[in-house]
């Protein structure tokens, strides 16, 4: 294996310090989309600028929004009636949110839209959403029923449909579309997973004065509603915070790691991870706008992953350092993310000496001493950052983490952030084979 400047060289170190958490990817993408569909000009402060954000911005500009970037803020003049544009082509990059949300919104237009994306986006399931949209009258042409590319257009017909809840983005996409449809639409969610992330979408709609009725997992939208412009400051990303927090929690330092730019009132699903760690015995202080991590030991256990399924890779690393074995379960959806995260994190941690084994719907993990190794990100940002944490807290040896460009998806300045916390993580480039250099 030959290293490139997309690789990271990681050495055991003792992290501590204070840092601002990057803006939330989930909130940034929703803010961009809603601003682009609103009347007037919206201002989004502290927006995350990443490949996913750019994919969403590009698509929204094709729908008629006018976007101006000023520093870390966006001024977006929306187009509340984007559905009578010329035929459109949306390249979603590697963004699952953009794929699902804009696919559903495209059915409000009689104009065909070609939906495509990166090679890795083709592995992200879309069939359950397309099936429900077809039942409402959407016209879809595709070469394969399971992935992009495809052409889609409406109009939809008023009615009721059932949507799979296996991925919360299906239900979120349908809710956003129903909110802006000119006619009544209702739907029921079958076996809703990742509930906090669907609730986050509904919180957004509620804050934008969209009316709907909710009876458990059935929702009814009256039709004929529109969005008004707004000002919004994106809070910190709890999913990204989990990696920074893990640097500090596993450290042998006597000093804490303090994470700022977080809102205790936020509905992000991965916020619940910090409450879980506290319940397991970790020394964590949760403030209104910050979290303070003190190096401490904690127990493993039986952990239902559904509320924070994106945290599976980093929780797998943490459980290697727990006082007793752990079983992470109810995480089938982790198989359909940017990688099969269950298989990917198990495979890579096994290289580092971890006793991490896939199960039908998660992982079984025994406490393990990790060592340096050559590992790979599987082109998945959360796998990459979890392995960086593992490398920093390995008991011996350096870790070469390959193919880390994917980290830009949610945390473009991850390496700088790690270094700010005194973690020995740096870009690495060499012109010779490296594998033998990283053996124990």
Swiss-Prot record:
3-phosphoshikimate binds at residues 25-26, 30, 168-169, 310, 337. Phosphoenolpyruvate binds at residues 25, 96, 124, 169, 341, 382, 409. It catalyses: 3-phosphoshikimate + phosphoenolpyruvate = 5-O-(1-carboxyvinyl)-3-phosphoshikimate + phosphate. Pathway: Metabolic intermediate biosynthesis; chorismate biosynthesis; chorismate from D-erythrose 4-phosphate and phosphoenolpyruvate: step 6/7. Keywords: Amino-acid biosynthesis, Aromatic amino acid biosynthesis, Cytoplasm, Transferase. Belongs to the EPSP synthase family. PANTHER family: AROM/DEHYDROQUINATE SYNTHASE, PENTAFUNCTIONAL AROM POLYPEPTIDE. This is 3-phosphoshikimate 1-carboxyvinyltransferase. The gene is aroA.
């Amino acid at each position: 294996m030959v290293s490139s400047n997309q690789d990271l060289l990681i050495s055991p170190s003792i992290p501590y310090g204070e840092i601002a958490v990057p803006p939330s990817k989930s909130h940034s993408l929703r803010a961009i989309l809603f601003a682009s569909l609103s009347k007037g000009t919206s201002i989004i402060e502290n927006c995350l600028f990443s490949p996913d954000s750019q994919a969403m911005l590009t698509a929204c500009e094709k729908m008629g929004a006018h976007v101006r970037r000023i520093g870390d803020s966006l001024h977006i003049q929306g187009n509340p009636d984007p559905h009578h544009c010329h035929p459109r082509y949306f390249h979603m990059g590697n963004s699952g949110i953009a794929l699902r949300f804009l696919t559903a919104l495209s059915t409000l237009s009689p104009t065909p839209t070609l939906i495509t994306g990166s090679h890795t986006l083709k592995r992200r399931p879309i069939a359950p959403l397309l099936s429900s949209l077809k039942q409402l009258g959407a016209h879809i042409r595709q070469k394969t029923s399971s992935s992009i590319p495809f052409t889609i257009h409406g109009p939809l017909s008023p009615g009721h449909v059932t949507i799979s809840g296996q991925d919360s983005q299906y239900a979120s996409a349908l809710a956003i579309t129903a909110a802006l449809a000119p006619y009544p639409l209702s739907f029921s969610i079958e076996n809703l997973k990742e509930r906090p992330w669907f609730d986050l979408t509904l919180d957004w709609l509620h804050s934008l004065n969209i009316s709907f009725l909710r009876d458990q997992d059935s929702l009814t939208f009256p039709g004929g509603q529109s969005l008004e412009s707004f000002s919004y400051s994106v809070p910190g990303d709890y999913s990204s915070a989990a990696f920074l927090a893990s640097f500090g929690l596993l450290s042998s330092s006597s000093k804490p790691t303090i994470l700022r730019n977080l809102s205790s009132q936020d509905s992000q699903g991965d916020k619940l991870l910090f409450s879980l760690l506290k319940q397991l015995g970790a020394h964590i202080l949760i403030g209104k706008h910050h979290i303070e991590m003190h190096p401490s030991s904690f127990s493993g256990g039986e952990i239902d992953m559904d509320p924070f399924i994106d945290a599976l890779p980093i929780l797998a690393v943490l459980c290697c350092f727990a006082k007793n074995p752990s079983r992470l379960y109810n995480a089938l959806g982790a198989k359909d993310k940017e990688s099969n995260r269950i298989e990917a994190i198990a495979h890579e941690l096994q290289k580092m000496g971890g006793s991490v084994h896939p199960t039908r719907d998660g992982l079984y993990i025994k406490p393990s001493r990790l060592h340096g190794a050559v590992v790979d990100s599987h082109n998945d940002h959360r796998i990459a950052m979890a392995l960086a944490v593992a490398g920093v807290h390995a008991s011996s040896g350096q870790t070469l983490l390959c193919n880390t460009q994917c980290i830009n998806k949610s945390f473009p300045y991850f390496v700088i952030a790690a270094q700010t916390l005194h973690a020995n993580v740096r870009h690495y480039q060499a012109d010779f084979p490296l594998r033998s250099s990283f053996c124990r």
